[in-house]
């Protein structure tokens, strides 16, 4: 690719605000933004115009299908592809995409995990457009597909995914934080957002060697074996010089992520041999979560192109560090105030101290729920032992705040 690749490719496969402003009539764009900012119901007429613009943009980029892209309780994403084709009376089929098709989908929910909250005879499930997370184009062997981020629920409204609880929690935090800000006299604050920047640690191994290990293939980790002759005893792999083969992978990975508007910022060797890390710039929590799912999917695809396998299991090898998603979480007002920023005089910053105390109280009273959210077989293999963090919930404030 030519020089200045970042500027050339960044966001090219995303139906972002800049594209919407260019594709939509001014009055429709203003109405859309108002709906988004105020959290109001989307007018059907506006939805039809947005859907048409989205379809035309996707067709310009070679798309033939669209999908409601959602995150069931499987740990990975799900999608069902529908083409833009609609039957015409006598002539050739026409290409259509309506506001109704944009807003709501109807995948079968019968075979997705539900935790027992969905009645077995109610097989129908619904996807609902998360209009706060931009649509994007996915390029693969199937061609180009327009992916619309959505929430997923049952026929009777129970959440069957991981996004719906996240959106609800973001709304709950916004509602209470706005209430507190008004008590401090910040009447101009209308919304408070959570921001997250989750890093992604991973291992890269030669694909030929990977295919010789059935335990890695079927479980994502080694179940038996001998320790490596050289592990991480010298800490010389951490931040070490990146090898050419890995650097080539990272270059391709960055370009794929930038196309999707993912702010891939930092890359380096991690502690364990063959372990590496990619860290993005933070963004709104639900968008950041969508991005992390895409990061993991793209890492695996790009690794195969380079004759490698990307291992995302939290503890693929015994005796060396595992992989995590350390992140920086914060809450920010729509006027740009970081509510967890202590400032130069934190002991005098009443607003900061109040929100900090609220976070401490929430962690203290809901430690079990927080621990449960990170409890799965892979993570439980990783937590504790010689690694940080331990398998308990704790808060470290630093000497000044303590």
Regions found by a protein language model. Name each.
Residues 1-29, 125-129, 134-147:
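Catalytic pocket of metal/acid-base enzymes, prominently hydrolases
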Residues 124-312, 317-402:
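Glycine-rich, acidic/polar active-site loops that bind/position phosphate-bearing ligands
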Residues 8-123:
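Active-site core of metal-dependent hydrolases
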Residues 4-10, 39, 270-274:
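Short N-terminal helix-initiation segments at or just after the protein's N-terminus
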